């Protein structure tokens, strides 16, 4: 099943291609909400739409993105300081006596320091980086939909929570970022045929068991191993991925627009 993709997220390019309107109010609401819930995720490619704001709404969104980055940077800098202290304490302890705990603390702190420095460098970089357009489940992605007779581009979460279902469905059904074709008239019947959208994808990634990829049975005592397949058309080609979407509402929670990509087994895994 597709678990990650590199997605076209240039909003004005999408608007021109599909003759669609950008749903600015929903984009603004999303970036405002992210200030309160820093766990909401987007790819850097989506944020880049607001690097050089030209309208009032773009300037407001740009300000929210900058405020979010400052909040995240402050948190990571605090965590970085803690790990540096942990490393220094471990190294002092090792000078006095070799212990497993001190050696583990040194190793873990060193790894985390490198990780936080890399994160902060990426956060502060103004350069376009490889993978800026890559999304994963629960990322918010621009999707082209038809609503009220209009084509709209709207940010939606890449894991669909169907309207009327409890929020606990996110954990109960973690695979709902994909909508299998053989279940469209079952689990997805509430939105299939009525609430469709399109995601523009440049390449995508599949998780596959290694023995399945090699078209063989597991050997005795062999444990399944995961293999990540990258489907990357050459020459480069934009693929239109059909999606199902839903607008979830609750009296005590923010509205949620979310979607699932319609998928099937990749061709190399099909048995017929």
Predicted regions and their residues:
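Short linear sequence motif anchored by a di-proline
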Residues: 1-272
């Amino acid at each position: 099943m597709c678990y990650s993709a590199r997605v076209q997220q240039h909003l004005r390019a999408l608007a021109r291609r599909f003759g669609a309107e950008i749903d600015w109010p929903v984009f603004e609401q999303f970036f405002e909400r992210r200030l309160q819930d820093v766990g909401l995720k987007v790819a850097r490619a989506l944020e880049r739409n607001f690097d050089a704001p030209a309208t009032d709404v773009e300037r407001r969104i740009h300000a929210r993105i900058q405020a979010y980055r400052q909040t995240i940077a402050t948190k990571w800098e605090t965590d970085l300081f803690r790990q540096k202290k942990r490393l220094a304490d471990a190294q002092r302890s090792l000078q006095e006596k070799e212990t497993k705990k001190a050696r583990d603390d040194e190793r873990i702190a060193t790894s985390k320091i490198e990780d936080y420095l890399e994160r902060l460098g990426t956060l502060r970089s103004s350069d376009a980086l490889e993978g800026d357009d890559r999304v994963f489940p629960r990322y918010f992605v621009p999707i082209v939909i038809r609503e009220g007779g209009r084509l709209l581009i709207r940010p939606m979460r890449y894991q669909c929570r169907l309207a009327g279902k409890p929020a606990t469905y996110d954990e109960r059904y973690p695979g709902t970022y994909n909508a299998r074709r053989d279940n469209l008239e079952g689990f997805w019947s509430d939105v299939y045929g009525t609430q469709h959208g399109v995601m523009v994808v440049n390449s995508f990634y599949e998780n596959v068991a290694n023995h399945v990829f090699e078209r063989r049975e597991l050997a005795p005592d062999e444990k399944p191993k995961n293999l990540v397949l990258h489907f990357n058309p050459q020459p480069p080609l934009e693929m239109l991925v059909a999606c199902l979407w839903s607008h979830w509402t609750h009296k005590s929670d923010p509205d949620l627009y979310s979607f699932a990509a319609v998928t099937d087994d990749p061709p190399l895994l099909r048995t017929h």
